């Protein structure tokens, strides 16, 4: 590891506090993963070859499954298993159950993420299950494994990770990230007793509007009682009373490591910043909750203010406080000091720029043409700048108060029929204001649900700030100066002339947002989604200056 800069007075005080905390930390706050026979399945130097075979009708049905907007706030899974034959590195397995996976950003009908469940006899390398993520938001194929690497170094239970090339019915779907499935075999790697309660959070938190986003993987009734008890403890107005109630149910010291590590790797779409993509395990030995990362394919990327559904965090890079547990703990002065100390400790022990950059180079060479150079450069830039940015914030001390999260549920309701046309050119996303009237929008609702601009423009291109997604944006300036944006995110495999793309559920849609430009930077307010319709691409010339034209129609679902 590179030697850290010579510490100033503030850093020296943090170091002393860290040492003092180490002596009294809970026994389970620093996890080390046990060696396991299945480690061969996660050899980082080996790209697995996974070939899936199932009937064409089953494959068509599987790839099109997904959540509807009506059940976005539901904890019920929209996916079902199909029977397949799976070959992994030449080892063939019959009667394997396969299903689609994903909640929001990773959903794809062209390259769906997959879960494989093998029969009673163990699968390849002794695995019972395989989880294959499509890296829909990460064309570098780096972010997930790097995040879990740092989490593991921070003493946080984290899945093992490597890569796989996946084909279905002979069609090469490209490189996927292969991670541990979150079940008892994984829990045994870190916990003496794997029979406790396991929870998954997808837009889930310990507050009434978000409690339905926490799925219980074990005994539903008993687990719900525990969640209600933790919710009650977090609602106590007195800080001391709140902290005692939380400490009886959560290993706070272990949570500090998880919390700080999420900010360290820029996991804006995790628990602390977006109440999303997390697991937690209630250890039967002490009845306390331990948090674990999940779905970090948007980490190691520039953090933009208000990035993510429901995210209200300011520009701080060193701490996230949207999650209710994070927000309430941050109110306590002693916890803030411990958090600062823990973050500095992780910078000194778990954040090794040379090793991380070497890992980026190794994986990039291993995967070759399957990685996107622009996305790799983003990851490298994040690694090089994180320490200085975070230590600058720690040096001045974190503010005593941050913006409190809004507890309105992220649910959507159909309120308007919307249609429109666009005729623009490619590679024009840098435009920030109306320059031509290259689009038209009709918004039918009674009463009106938005203040519609009088004129619209359209831009199109590949957005590096959206993981190099192909986007078309229809935008108009209101008299107030705010900009209304309908932003279509399009699967690159479908971006071609003559394509008729269904807008349905959370796979293909347009985000409807309001932008307010301020001296400190743009403020983004999500309004809802345009879906349940169709996007028609008449002409697609995806080169700089090429023509992009078409039309759209659908239903606007308002976020409430």
Predicted regions and their residues:
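Phosphate/dinucleotide-binding and metal-coordinating scaffold of catalytic cores
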Residues: 24-482, 492-510, 514-546, 556-560
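Bacterial N-terminal signal peptides
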Residues: 11-22
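Residue-level micro-sites within transmembrane alpha helices that shape
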Residues: 9-10, 268
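N-terminal secretory signal peptides that target proteins for export/translocation
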Residues: 1-9
């Amino acid at each position: 590891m590179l030697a850290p800069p010579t510490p100033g007075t503030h850093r020296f005080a943090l170091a002393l506090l860290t040492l003092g905390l180490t002596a009294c930390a809970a026994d389970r706050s620093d996890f080390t993963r046990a060696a396991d026979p299945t480690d061969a399945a996660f050899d980082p130097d080996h790209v697995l070859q996974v070939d899936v075979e199932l009937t064409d009708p089953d494959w068509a049905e599987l790839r099109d499954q997904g959540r509807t907007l009506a059940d976005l706030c539901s904890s019920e899974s929209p996916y079902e298993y199909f029977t397949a034959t799976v070959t992994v590195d030449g080892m063939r397995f019959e009667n394997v159950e396969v299903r689609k996976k994903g909640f929001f950003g990773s959903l794809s009908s062209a390259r769906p993420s997959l879960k494989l469940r093998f029969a009673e006899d163990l699968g390849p390398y002794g695995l019972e299950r395989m989880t294959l993520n499509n890296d829909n938001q990460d064309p570098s194929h780096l972010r997930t494994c790097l995040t879990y690497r740092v989490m593991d170094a921070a003493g946080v239970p984290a899945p093992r990770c490597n890569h796989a090339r996946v084909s279905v019915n002979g069609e090469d779907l490209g490189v996927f990230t292969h991670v541990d499935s979150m079940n008892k075999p994984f829990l045994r790697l870190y916990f003496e007793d794997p029979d406790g309660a396991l929870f998954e959070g997808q837009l889930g938190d310990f507050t009434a509007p978000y409690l339905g986003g926490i799925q219980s993987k074990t005994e539903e009734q008993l687990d719900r009682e525990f969640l209600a008890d933790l919710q009650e403890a977090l609602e106590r107005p007195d800080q001391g009373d709140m902290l005692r109630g939380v400490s009886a149910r959560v290993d706070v010291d272990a949570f500090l490591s998880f919390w700080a590590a999420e900010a360290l790797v820029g996991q804006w779409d995790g628990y602390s910043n977006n109440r999303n993509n997390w697991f937690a395990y209630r250890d039967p030995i002490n009845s306390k909750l331990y948090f674990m990362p999940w779905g970090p394919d948007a980490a190691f990327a520039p953090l933009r203010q208000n990035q993510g559904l429901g995210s209200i965090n300011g520009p701080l890079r060193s701490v996230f406080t949207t999650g209710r547990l994070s927000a309430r703990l941050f109110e306590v002065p002693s916890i803030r000091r411990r958090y600062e100390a823990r973050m500095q400790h992780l910078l000194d022990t778990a954040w090794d720029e040379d090793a991380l950059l070497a890992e980026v180079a190794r994986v990039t060479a291993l995967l070759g043409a399957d990685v996107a150079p622009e996305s790799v450069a983003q990851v490298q830039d994040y690694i090089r700048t994180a320490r200085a940015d975070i230590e600058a914030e720690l040096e001045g001390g974190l503010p005593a108060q941050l913006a409190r999260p809004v507890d309105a549920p992220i649910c959507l309701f159909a309120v308007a029929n919307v249609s429109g046309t666009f005729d623009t050119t490619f590679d024009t996303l840098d435009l920030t204001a109306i320059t031509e009237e290259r689009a038209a929008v009709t918004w039918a609702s009674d009463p009106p649900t938005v203040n519609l601009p009088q004129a619209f423009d359209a831009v199109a291109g590949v957005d590096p700030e959206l993981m190099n997604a192909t986007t078309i944006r229809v935008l108009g300036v209101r008299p107030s100066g705010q900009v209304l944006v309908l932003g279509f995110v399009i699967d690159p495999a479908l971006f071609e002339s003559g394509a008729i793309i269904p807008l349905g559920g959370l796979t293909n849609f347009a985000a409807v947002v309001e932008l307010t430009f301020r001296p400190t930077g743009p403020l983004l307010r999500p309004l809802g989604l345009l879906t349940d319709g169709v996007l028609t691409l008449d002409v697609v010339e995806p080169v700089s200056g090429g023509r992009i034209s078409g039309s759209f129609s659908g239903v606007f679902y308002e976020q409430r």
